[in-house]
């Protein structure tokens, strides 16, 4: 009897232990599953919290930085190029009105200038020079800028790349005018030119080459370069012929390094222009780009 009771108690004890082990295993399994689900849920939540564009931002930033770098580099290059283009290489010698190199610039140059524009032939003359790939200064008068046609001609000349000079409003001798009248002749023309082409003239030439102290100071205040000429012939009767004019302009004894050639808006000058340019080039003279002419102050800064 005792054996049977002990056996029954032992059996009950074993059953109880087995159930507890199963419960513990289930609890542990549930705990592990719960932790796994919690971790997966946490990871999912972290992935959802990160914006979808995050992975794209570095690429966008790199693209932006690359673009910005290219733009910055382009700006610097452009500024350096503009600076180089604007750096003067020649000045006007006011004792003889020739062009002088500032440092190691080519001394064998001549400057072409055309006065009294745009009367009748200036636009054609500009087209001829453009075709020959050379430049000249077109000195304009206010009384040739009164009509829309004349103003459009000036716009076209400027658009072709030719610098514009101030030759006064009405071509009167400055020495016969009061200071107030001189001011009007000079400044009002610069105002008019700016109104037409968007910029003021860089050069000034007085009618008949006669300046006054007041006019010279005013020109300086206006930031213009004072200029006369070294030689010219097209107003003389014997040279009012294209062939004769071309011959004297190229073969005169006055031609030398830095010569400042004066011509006018005239039919015979227009017809002689190509031969003048080619004749000068045949003598190994370079036609000077007026954009390379600076002031004495600019030259001093470079020294």
What are the residue ranges of the model-derived segments?
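Active-site beta->alpha N-cap acidic-glycine motif
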Residues: 78-173, 192
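Generic structural signal for well-ordered alpha-helices
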Residues: 126, 154-155, 186-190, 273-277
């Amino acid at each position: 009897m005792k054996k049977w009771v002990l056996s029954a108690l032992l059996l009950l004890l074993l059953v109880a232990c087995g159930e507890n082990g199963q419960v513990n295993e289930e609890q542990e399994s549930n705990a592990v599953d719960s932790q796994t689900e919690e971790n997966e849920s946490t990871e999912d939540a972290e992935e959802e919290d990160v914006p979808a564009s995050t992975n794209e931002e570095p690429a966008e930033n790199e693209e932006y930085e690359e673009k910005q770098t290219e733009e910055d580099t382009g700006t610097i290059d452009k500024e350096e190029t503009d600076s180089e283009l604007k750096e003067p290489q020649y000045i006007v010698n006011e004792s003889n009105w020739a062009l002088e190199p500032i440092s190691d610039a080519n001394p064998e140059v001549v400057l072409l200038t055309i006065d009294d524009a745009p009367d009748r032939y200036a636009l054609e003359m500009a087209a001829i020079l453009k075709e020959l790939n050379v430049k000249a200064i077109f000195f304009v008068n206010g009384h040739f800028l009164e009509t829309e046609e004349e103003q459009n001609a000036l716009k076209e000349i400027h658009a072709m790349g030719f610098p514009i000079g101030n030759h006064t409003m009405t071509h009167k001798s400055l020495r016969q005018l009061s200071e107030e009248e001189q001011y009007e002749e000079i400044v009002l023309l610069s105002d008019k030119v700016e109104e037409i082409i968007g910029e003021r003239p860089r050069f000034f030439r007085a009618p008949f080459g006669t300046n006054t102290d007041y006019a010279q100071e005013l020109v300086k205040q206006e930031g213009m370069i004072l200029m006369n000429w070294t030689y010219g012939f097209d107003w003389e009767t014997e040279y009012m012929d294209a062939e004769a004019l071309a011959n004297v302009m190229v073969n005169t004894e006055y031609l030398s390094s830095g010569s400042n050639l004066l011509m006018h808006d005239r039919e015979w000058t227009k017809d002689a222009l190509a031969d003048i340019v080619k004749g000068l080039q045949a003598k190994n003279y370079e036609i000077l780009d007026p954009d390379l002419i600076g002031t004495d102050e600019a030259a001093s800064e470079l020294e």
